[in-house]
Amino acid sequence: KEELAEKSDVLISCITSADGLLFEDERIFKPGITIIPVHMRGFQNCDTVFDRVFGDDTDHVKNFKYFGQFKDFNEIGEVLAGRDKGRKSQLQRILAYNYGLALHDVIFVSKIYELVSDRYDIRDIETNKPTDKFWI
């Protein structure tokens, strides 16, 4: 899994259970990566070192252990509304904590689809039903 993390531009995690961190050393994430831990587990070590952190709602994340130490926080809705630029440089490492609000889930999937649909035949992407409670 470390090799996957090291090479990824976008990493989306939808796990429902995590004991601790998924990746002990946050330095494996290259500049420019965006991590979207939908259920907000396993990436807390990135909270204080990533360049920007977004949440779908401040009230959902304001009690996070490291909330006061986020370098640059805003709500993802501000980006979608055009009031926040979002990524300010191609080197920024970004966390987007998505608590699972359905509207944001649909928007994320829509944007990802737009980015990949002209390069890949989406029907050819293999998906496997998870067999464990924990998966990436």
Language-model-detected regions and their locations in the chain:
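Short, well-ordered alpha-helix to beta-strand connector turns
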Residues: 8, 32-33, 49-52
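Short acidic low-complexity segments
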Residues: 1-8, 23
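Short glycine-/small-residue-rich Rossmann-like dinucleotide-binding loops
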Residues: 15-17, 39-40, 58
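Redox-cofactor binding/interface segments in oxidoreductases and associated redox assembly factors
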Residues: 12-13, 36-37, 55
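Adenosine-phosphate binding glycine-rich loop
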Residues: 42, 46-136
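Glycine/threonine-rich flexible loop motifs
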Residues: 19-27
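A short, aliphatic-rich alpha-helical micro-motif
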Residues: 4-6, 28-29, 47-48
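Short helix-capping and hinge/turn segments at secondary-structure transitions, especially at repeat
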Residues: 10-20
